[in-house]
């Protein structure tokens, strides 16, 4: 149990050496911890911070009540070589972070190339950035500069001030079978059309986005900033608006006046083979996201998982 901590609760730091180097920092497990009230002296502290390490497992932790990011894994900016790879950030319960103190944060944050890294089974909610900064950067899952070769699957992110999922720029990421819902600006955002999508090997694919449930309420954007067809591979996602039904909006740039309806986005080739239907959550308005067995999302290929697996192992902490 970590409670009322001045800075990081858990801090892992190695050097950016070759993965075969005998001094590489690797094979560490951070699991089944309760982490709360971190960063009480250094407000920008992180609950679990991993720098230059591989094969680290961060799982079954409950992390809450911090002023900045809960889990952060990097640390190379852009597409340069990074020893950080094959990390597992799984089945964590993360909530009530940011709290309006700082900006540019995520429940889970990654930086740089990370082949083999998986973000899975996490529940993230109530991430709030500093309103004096325009609420900038209250993200659920935040893949920052150069984040690449990362799989994001079976996560539930909701009630985030900015976006449930945010990709600054990166390549060859897979985002599948997640629930991104009821967040402030949009549910999913990529900034890939800033001209920094292409790594040195000439690749152009920023992201595969499929089999996700994307739920808005009252016209907030489902997806934003997706004008780069070459980098954007979206298909077979489930879209719905809690208040407006099939009246769903997509932003094709950073400006609100570039918002278009989902039907027009389909014509432009930005949205492919969607299921536009109520996913039939048990009570989404009250944040109960259990799916009805007759859900059209399941019929469309979405695979439910047990949300109760997130957080510390019951009865042990």
Enumerate the language-model features and the residues they cover.
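Right-handed parallel beta-helix
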Residues: 1-7, 20-39, 47, 54-68, ...
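Asp-box/WD-like beta-propeller blade repeats and closely related beta-sheet repeat scaffolds
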Residues: 15-17
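Acidic, glycine- and Ser/Thr-rich low-complexity intrinsically disordered tracts
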Residues: 197-317
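Structured core elements
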Residues: 11, 57, 72, 107-109, ...
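Amphipathic alpha-helical surface "interface" segments used
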Residues: 51, 56, 313-317
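Generic hydrophobic alpha-helical scaffold/packing signal
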Residues: 109, 139, 153-156, 166, ...
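Short glycine/acidic-rich loop motifs that flank beta-strands on beta-rich extracellular proteins
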Residues: 6-12, 39-46, 67-73, 82, ...
């Amino acid at each position: 149990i970590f409670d009322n901590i001045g800075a990081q609760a858990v801090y892992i730091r190695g050097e950016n050496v070759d993965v075969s180097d005998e001094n590489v920092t690797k094979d560490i497990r951070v699991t089944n911890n309760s982490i709360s009230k971190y960063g009480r002296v250094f407000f920008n502290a992180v609950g679990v911070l991993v720098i230059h390490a591989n094969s680290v497992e961060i799982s079954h932790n409950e992390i809450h009540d911090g002023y900045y990011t809960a889990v952060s894994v990097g640390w190379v900016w852009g597409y340069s070589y990074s020893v950080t790879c094959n990390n597992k950030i799984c089945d964590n319960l993360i909530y009530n972070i940011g709290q309006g103190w700082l900006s540019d944060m995520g429940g889970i944050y990654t930086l740089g190339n990370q082949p083999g890294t998986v973000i899975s089974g996490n529940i993230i909610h109530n991430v709030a950035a500093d309103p004096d900064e325009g609420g900038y950067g209250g993200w659920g899952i935040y893949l920052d500069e150069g984040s690449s070769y990362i799989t994001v699957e079976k996560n539930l992110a909701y009630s985030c001030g900015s976006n449930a999922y945010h990709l600054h720029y990166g390549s060859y990421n897979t985002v599948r079978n997640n629930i991104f819902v009821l967040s402030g600006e949009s549910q999913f955002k990529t900034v890939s059309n800033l001209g920094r999508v292409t790594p040195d090997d000439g690749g152009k694919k920023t992201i595969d986005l499929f089999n996700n449930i994307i739920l808005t309420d009252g016209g907030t954007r489902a997806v934003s900033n997706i004008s780069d067809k070459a980098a954007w591979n979206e298909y077979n996602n489930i879209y719905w608006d809690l208040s407006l039904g099939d009246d769903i909006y997509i932003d094709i740039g950073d400006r609100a006046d570039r918002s278009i309806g989902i039907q027009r986005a389909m014509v432009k080739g930005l949205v492919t083979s969607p299921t536009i239907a109520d996913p039939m959550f048990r009570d989404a308005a009250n944040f109960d996201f259990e799916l009805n067995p007759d859900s059209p999302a399941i019929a469309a290929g979405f695979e439910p998982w047990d949300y109760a697996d997130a957080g510390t192992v019951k009865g042990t902490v």
